[in-house]
Amino acid sequence: MLKKIYNKVTHEWDTSVEEALKSFIRLPALSPDFDKKWEENGVLLKALEDAQAWAEKQGIKGLRCEIIKDDGFTPCLFVEVDATSDKKFERSVFFYGHLDKQPPNEGWDPDKSAWEPVIQNGRLYGRGAVDDGYAFYTSLAAVKALQTLGIPHPRCVGLFETCEESSSRHYESYLKEAEQKLGDIGLVIALDSCCGDYDRLWVTSSLRGMLGGTIEVRTLNVGVHSGEASGIVPESFMIVRRLLDRIEDSRTGEIIPRVFQTKISEEIHKQNVGVAESLGDRIFAAYPWHGKTEPLTKDACEALLNRSWRPELTVTGVDGMPSVENAGNVMRPYTTVKIGMRLPPDVDAEKASTALEEIITAEPPFNADVKYVPTVASNGWSAKAAAPWITKAF
């Protein structure tokens, strides 16, 4: 039966899902944080309308779709599929996904584009397809496969948002609004994470939290010639580096303050040892390394723990610096960097954000003007021990 399901889902992908995802890739459905005119241009709504239109053409029995749009909030798509009548299920399955995207950024291969789908070596490239436009389409394709093969399934519901890449700030309101429609949920499926390989099903047992914000350092009112100022005026980027050194050991990448860390249990360590043994060097081969760059650690288990249960800092943006092409001999008046810190799943993000601001702004070097503006603080998540029935199913 599993082979029949696989063949049916593969057929649905080849004949329907892939084309729907190609259309989705062509939509510049940027999340609100990256498109201030999202409501005016209507692209997020168009992404939901396309998804709804596709779903209603699939012939799924008992399907109902509804776009929910509250004033000033990004829209959501509510989906419901009745349980099959030949077997009674007490609780429902909940599907989660999102249809908003992050900006395309730079670095695309010459033969690929953010907004034009390309299939190469059996893989589909384009912005937003894997994060995570496919979630909606594959969830319903799975339900359709069960119905086509006569396999009973429980009632299925879903609430697909368009604000995930902007911290899902509207989603909780929609969940409360749809609480009666959603009913009693027995299983939540979110197709929005990573996998170790394409040979087996991977289940995410935890996700790190996140905090982020901007650090601004100002030393001058206007830029001045570096020949006149250097050696007297402290350089703003130098101060930024010193502030970041309060958080991260730049030699190792280790986060220094204990407030951002947690104790890793023996069970978590054991799980990661098992994954490391299964994947080996594929853990490192998954990344597009340049030249002879080496990983922070060559120990596969430690690398997995770094990625899942330890805090890590990333600088994601910078203002106050001209491009190299346009850079002259000027000492710039300020530097602003945007940072993101992944947090262990059980660390309180709000407390960590407050601590970060205190660490950054305390006793500014050279009494420079230092500001930290938090932009996000999201808690992580760690799954409870799986119920026996779902462990058996997997």
Please tell me what each predicted stretch does.
Residues 244-245, 252, 385-394:
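Active-site-adjacent substrate-binding region
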